[in-house]
Amino acid sequence: MNAFPPDPRKKSGFRTALEFTGIPPSWLDKRPRLPSRNWLIFLSVTQTFIGYYAYDRHQSRKIRQEYVDRVKHLAEDPLQSLDFPRTVTVYSAKWPGDDDWDRGSRYFRKYVKVCRSPLSQGGPFTHSFLAQPIFVAAAIDYTVIAGKRHGDLATRVANDIKTERRVALGLDPPPLSAPSLLAKGMTEAKRRRKHEGGTAVVGRAAFKEYMAGLRRGWTENLERLDEDEKLSRELEGDGHFDEPELSPGLSSDSLADAEPLPTPSRLPPSRPPGIYSPLSTPIRPPSPFPSPTAAPARDPGTDVPPPAYLPPQPALLLVPFVNLVGIKLVPLMIWEFFNERYKVRAGAEAAYKLVSCVARPFERTDLDFDASAEGYYKPSTASIPTDVQKARTEYYKALPEKLATARALSRGEREPTKLEIEAPPPTEVELRAERLKKEARWRADERGWESVCPDKPVEWDDRWEGVLEVFADPPTERWQ
């Protein structure tokens, strides 16, 4: 007798066929049921985040394509063989508190330009990029200039303006290897297209540095100065490398057989060795008759006054930029990750303003551009001047001991120790060069932070009234 009662349920032909395939009957008898509570929570949360992420990226692509369709007809205009495309100069500065100095440039490339293939051009400080939508749709080229440290961008802008002024006044030759009418015409056309292209400034820090460089470039004289040489002359009289005075209790008999110590008058000036350093050139006795050619030639740009008015300047595209740095801002970082469409729309609108070429006069209220971004600076940035002064104090506190060791070894007053043989201490010449490099770095950091700190207002000159322009929103019916 069969111990198992027959299954009263009637089997369908499909089920019978599946049983003959070798599938266990227990699998076929299993009925679907809801997952456990924990699995339901996990699946719900995961699918919610995935769905929101997919929706955000879909909207981002849709927004970008919308603005590309608005301007792509501009690329259909014919361009002559000797013409240049419209060129935009993009300025980006280091975000205070972030060691990554290129964040602003990457923000511009990702949201305003969407560039994917960088090409180096003009050294490590300047980069050109092959454009993708929206600018390539409008046949616009661009160049990014980024400052690696605070103040680099202001110095770059000021030096570029001074170079243009010197060339315009005939103090320097134009940057042409073989001047010709054709080359001159091409240069003028390129300069005109660059002026028409405009200038994009990314973020509050870059805006402050750009305006500071603009003021320095148009108000300072055109004298060419070697910054290292100027700083070396300033450091000559600080006394850190002066020879200590001879002790009055030391008799001359004790120095009869010893190597004479150099007096301060016999020492070379306190300056680092260089191409024209007195440490590398022989010292000549002074001539009893002054030579008329001994005095250095005066730079003709020293006496050039600043212009009474400014020439037309490229219109400014002010691009808001906030870089979230720090653990306290992690919630905002997460929110931005799932709401990237807002950045995409802001970048597309900024590019749309530039492409449309609709500008308005610069107003005083524009000086408050992106002022709210300064509230996201790390609190530690307020101690930058204190940190610089602390590093300077510690360095000069340890300098006398290093200098005494270098002089004692160079004069043979004592034998080097085992550690000094394995790792020779720096010589006096190396200490001078190191001090010059550190002082240049400290002073540049102090000036740079002073130009971008939240307490510092944006530079302004009354001569800029009516000269500077800002790209504005175009009329809505223009592109419809």
Q: Language-model segments: which ranges?
A:
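Single-pass hydrophobic alpha-helical transmembrane segments typical
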Residues: A17-H73
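Short, flexible/disordered secondary-structure transition segments
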Residues: S60-K62, L74, P78-S81, Y142-I145, ...
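N-terminal organellar targeting/addr​essing segments, predominantly mitochondrial targeting sequences
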Residues: M1-L34, I161-R165, L171-S177
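Beta-sheet entry/capping signal
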Residues: T87-T89, D141
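Mature, function-bearing regions of proteins
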Residues: H58, Y67-R86, S105-R106, F125
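Non-transmembrane interaction and regulatory regions of membrane-associated proteins
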Residues: G97-C115, Q121-Q480
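Short loop/turn segments at strand-loop or loop-helix junctions that form parts
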Residues: V90-W95
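Beta-strand elements of modular eukaryotic interaction domains
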Residues: W39, D77-Q80, K113-V114
